[in-house]
Swiss-Prot record:
Family per similarity comment: Belongs to the universal ribosomal protein uL3 family.
Native source species: Karelsulcia muelleri (strain GWSS)
HAMAP family: Ribosomal_uL3_B
GO cellular component: cytosolic large ribosomal subunit
Protein name, entry field: Large ribosomal subunit protein uL3
UniProt keyword terms in alphabetical order: Ribonucleoprotein, Ribosomal protein, RNA-binding, rRNA-binding
Lineage: Bacteria, Pseudomonadati, Bacteroidota, Flavobacteriia, Flavobacteriales
Length: 206
């Protein structure tokens, strides 16, 4: 299998073989059930849908209940689509035994949302002018956003204040330090995108 779905549990630290204290992230990954298999003949490409994290029946709408019933699965909170690697069939259970320690993986998730932020925090602007000689309220200002009557518009891509964070982020070549098959935990070196309990996709390198 090319990857697995996980949930960000939090961060801790552990000592490596050299005695260095290494920060690491704990991810609860799997077990995931294989739902729909998409083929090139029928859908135009090859992939499979994985379901992860149990969901209550009362919180699931009828179309989704019929969808999960079709593939003989209980309702799941998250469904992600991943490329197929190997002989995968609908109903198979994907666990962490497809990974091994010291393997490098790519981790995809959504970064923490920061809300509406100004240009100093969002883009690293320095503000306008010096903080002296009577200036007051310009220390975090964006400054000019363009010329006047020519071109009579603001160019696309001009860096301005706006919503920050909550973007799709992929961290590449993250090392697996330890695998806990009993509790379905992956210990990854360093940090991962998103807040606690946010969902992640852990992919093998191609």
């Amino acid at each position: 299998m090319s990857g697995i779905i996980g949930k960000n549990i939090g961060m801790t630290s552990m000592y490596d073989e050299s005695g260095f204290n290494v920060p690491c992230s704990i991810i609860e990954a799997g077990p995931c059930i294989v739902l729909q298999i998409k083929t090139k003949e029928k859908d135009g490409y090859d992939s499979c849908q994985l379901g992860f994290d149990e969901k209550k029946y009362k919180n699931t709408n009828k179309p989704l209940l019929f969808f999960f019933k079709k593939f003989k699965s209980t309702p799941k909170k998250k469904i992600f689509e991943l490329p197929i690697k190997g002989n995968i069939k609908s109903g198979n259970i994907i666990k962490l035994n497809c990974f091994h320690e010291n393997e490098l993986v790519n981790i995809t998730g959504f970064s923490k949302g920061k809300g509406f932020q100004g240009v100093v925090k969002r883009h690293g602007f320095s503000g306008v002018g010096e903080r002296s000689h009577g200036q007051h309220n310009r220390s975090r200002a964006p400054g000019s956003i363009g010329a006047g009557s020519d071109p009579s518009r603001v160019f696309k891509g001009t860096r301005m204040a706006g919503r920050m964070g909550n973007k799709k982020v992929t961290l590449k070549n993250r090392k697996i330090l330890k695998i806990d098959l009993l509790n379905n935990f992956l210990i990854i070196k360093g940090s991962v995108p998103g807040a606690k309990n946010s969902y992640l996709i852990i992919k093998k390198l191609k």
